[in-house]
Structures are given as structure tokens and as C-alpha cells.
Amino acid sequence: MTHQHLKEAVDSHFETIQSELEHLAAIPSVSAAGFDPESVRESAEYVANLLRKAGFPDVRILGPPGAHPAVYASYPAPEGAPTVLLYAHHDVQPAGEGWNSPPFEPIERNGRVYARGIADDKSGVLMHVGAMLAHGGTPPVGVKVIIEGEEEIGSLHLEDFL
């Protein structure tokens, strides 16, 4: 696939990727004491479904008791090709003060979309999904993805997931 073909493939999926990012950002997956951990589980389930739709044949939600769930996905390497590991996280910090709009209701202003967690790191999740879509669900390398739900509280169980 040439750079031009890859760019065209990314462009063809851009609206879908942006829409999915906005849906993911609307899930208040706050990873902090005093917040409902169910929203982090909901976020993990949404991420798992995104990865399945993108073409990953093996997608699992992982989590030891008491942990916020991580999502693992893999695509086998073609013969002789390397495997890459991609990382992102789907949890966010509490919104805090200073928002001009509800933090979990994505809004577009001046060509940019704003919502809690959209840059850190739900866009990273969609970047991985978009790369898989751009390759038509069949990348030229093996791909393993880990998307954790505890980065904002110190990645307490990341080693367990790996």
C-alpha cells in the first residue's frame, strides 16, 4: 500500500472514526475514587466492540477482581512479518472546573471537538482502530493491542494484563 493509498483509506474512514470517538468520549469512564466503576466497564465494552468491527479476530476484556478492565486484541502476523504492540487507555481524570460545556457531551468548535478524555487518550484508541480500518482489517504485520482502564490511577494492574 502506497502512502497515497493509505491516506485515501484514512480519509475514507475519517467521519466514522470521528463519530466513534465522540461516542467513546461521551462515556464518563472516570478512573478515580468516588466514581462509578461501571462507566469504565461500559467504556471497555465499547472499545472491545470497536476493535472487533475493525477486524481483530481475538478481542478480550481483561481484569482481575477489583481492577478497571483492560481490552486486549490481536491480529496474527502474516508469514515472516513482525508483530507490533500498540497501547492506549480508555479511562479519564475527573472533569474538574472550568468547562464551557458539559465535559462528557462532545462539542465541535472552530473545527475541533472538545470533551473530557478526547485527547488523553480516547483519540489514541481510535487511532489504532483507524489504522486497522485503513488496512481493510488485514494489516501487513501482526498487531497486538492493549487498552487499559487504569492509566489515570497509576496503571495498577497493567503488569498483570501483560
Regions found by a protein language model. Give the residues of each.
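Acidic/histidine-rich catalytic neighborhood of metal-dependent amide-processing enzymes
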Residues: 117, 121-162
